[in-house]
């Protein structure tokens, strides 16, 4: 079973290489890429089910056991992220190819989407710091290509900000890796967890943890958000959905992994700072969603706002808070894909990004109104939608930790997030007569189909929350309880650690 853990990363990589030679064969590219991601999703879910019912699996490349060799770790946290990511990439590929454009393969876009997916999945699966950096770079290089492909001045400006800030974040990450290796002498997650446990009062470790905090915050748009709104606003629908679903979530995943398994010995410093940054991020996101009439920018700030929710749960440093953060992270990958599909469909049908031109649209497309309601309630955390279980657990974590300011901010900003989208929906149903003059294009059947799939999944994830919570609880216990991790992952390292 352990050998199968490489497949979720290997299959998209092989497919990406093949697509280089099928650039002008749109039908072959479409069938190959979508089929690959469907198979990838099925394999990932099968591995996740196995891990939840048994124990985490590891793969040591070249026969070199940790901490000396390259290792992949498949636990509930990593495989949950891989499964959800593979699923949304499948829909995003279908969305992109569904347009039926002859130039869909121009600039090898499907190839770079798959390479970005390789970097994302590799980041989830890797079990050592240096390879995490390598996977981040694969992901970022592919994203640099995707965000810079355009002919407008607006897109070029957004791309420059995106590239510069992410390069700075990568430098900080590499600096943190070097400092940690010099101090601790290992890069493997399991070995790091063991050694750091005996260095609780080391101020150097606390300083290093803050370097990682800033580095991952730049990836997750936690306070350091300047690159996100402009970059997402200029991308086409499938790329915006891809970035919203995955790019910031990899940074959030890294924060969860590092500040539960590794850097949890000085919560009065690290986790207090996480809570503070989460609160600032929620405030920034709340102002952003009500400040613009551009629906793409509203959606971009919704991404920032949700990162604040996730990190608030992590910062509580409680089982319930971290459990809620993991649940909400997985949920948000799906919900943000749905949100950007909805926003992209609005722009497609109306031809405008300003919501004032959407008057009467919902009357022409009743199903679209239903999809919009689902995404609003999911973002707001209204039961029985998928955002509810995660937010309840984050609430519990905040109360347990005595973080009433963060709790109040989460409630208020959740209402603001819903208001910003209800405002758009109100125009869609009850807008003034000027909007009626817009000639709306009908929504293609394939887009309705993809929206339907996401709507069903969002509803199912809320209704079947106990099933998902079993996975997230397992992930939380494994990463927050050191004895559980050591009993299940790389047990041979106990001998290495004492030599």
Swiss-Prot record:
Its main location: membrane. Pfam families: Proton_antipo_M (PF00361). Keywords: Antiport, Cell membrane, Ion transport, Membrane, Transmembrane, Transmembrane helix, Transport. It is a multi-pass membrane protein. The chain crosses the membrane at residues 1-21, 31-51, 77-97, 107-127, 129-149, 160-180, 208-228, 239-259, 272-292, 307-327, 329-349, 367-387, 402-422, 449-469. It is found in: Cell membrane. InterPro entries: CPA3_Na-H_Antiporter_D, NADH_UbQ_OxRdtase, ND/Mrp_TM. One of its GO terms (cellular component) is plasma membrane. GO terms for molecular function: antiporter activity; NADH dehydrogenase (ubiquinone) activity. The keyword rRNA processing does not apply. GO terms for biological process: ATP synthesis coupled electron transport. May form a heterooligomeric complex that consists of seven subunits: mnhA2, mnhB2, mnhC2, mnhD2, mnhE2, mnhF2 and mnhG2. NCBIfam families: PRK12663.1. Belongs to the CPA3 antiporters (TC 2.A.63) subunit D family. This is Putative antiporter subunit mnhD2. It comes from Staphylococcus epidermidis (strain ATCC 35984 / DSM 28319 / BCRC 17069 / CCUG 31568 / BM 3577 / RP62A). The lineage of its organism: Bacteria, Bacillati, Bacillota, Bacilli, Bacillales.
